[in-house]
Amino acid sequence: MIKWPWKVQESAHQTALPWQEALSIPLLTGLTEQEQSKLVTLAERFLQQKRLVPLQGFELDSLRSCRIALLFCLPVLELGLEWLDGFHEVLIYPAPFVVDDEWEDDIGLVHNQRIVQSGQSWQQGPIVLNWLDIQDSFDASGFNLIIHEVAHKLDTRNGDRASGVPFIPLREVAGWEHDLHAAMNNIQEEIELVGENAASIDAYAASDPAECFAVLSEYFFSAPELFAPRFPSLWQRFCQFYQQDPLQRLHRANDTDSFSATNVH
């Protein structure tokens, strides 16, 4: 179900959205009750402000809408929903989609090619996603399409183009750039050693700073146990920027699981 901004008051009294069910995905397991409540509040506002547009026969129901909204709002849980200003629509294909890509080489020749995309984020336009990869974003694997595209949106708030440096105090920019490029170099060294497919972190992170920030944002929220020990200095910068500590959440979730296991009779 799509909630339209001009129908908020009308629909709010008619349909109770399945937030409790929507929260029951591995990615959100470690959230406290207070964090869950805050996230749902943001997600409700997100659905009031943004238009979710299903394409090519994709069917969008209330549970899917809620989970999409929760994933959009997780990165801005402490930053605030205003950090997601600048776009009003989320276009959702049923599967990865084909786009016409145009690029210019080093000698000025323009090339055209058709490529398959999982998602796209335009600075002053919609975010484009696909449901197959959204579904794969519910677990804690290090892959999260929505967080990746949200990171690009957060990145561009700092200037005209994504640079890998989000909107942080000027005094912190040099340190951020140093740690981000060090991470890129480290990932590239691993790729050269074991190959892209065997690398422990998505090789796309080594392609440029903007993609490194987006990819590591995926790992920050969905695989903190891989990010934090490998890049501790950059991890602290991400914690400071997002004002969250997903590794602490992971430990809390694991402690809860251990306690439950020891009390099974």
Swiss-Prot record:
One of its GO terms (cellular component) is cytosol. It is found in: Cytoplasm. It comes from the Bacteria. Coiled coil: none annotated. Its cofactor is Zn(2+). GO terms for biological process: proteolysis. Its EC number is 3.4.11.-. InterPro entries: MetalloPept_cat_dom_sf (IPR024079), MtfA_enterob (IPR057256), MtfA_fam (IPR010384), MtfA_N (IPR042252). Its main location: cytoplasm. Involved in the modulation of the activity of the glucose-phosphotransferase system (glucose-PTS). Interacts with the transcriptional repressor Mlc, preventing its interaction with DNA and leading to the modulation of expression of genes regulated by Mlc, including ptsG, which encodes the PTS system glucose-specific EIICB component. Shows zinc-dependent metallopeptidase activity. Interacts with Mlc. This is Mlc titration factor A. It comes from Escherichia coli (strain ATCC 8739 / DSM 1576 / NBRC 3972 / NCIMB 8545 / WDCM 00012 / Crooks). The gene is mtfA.
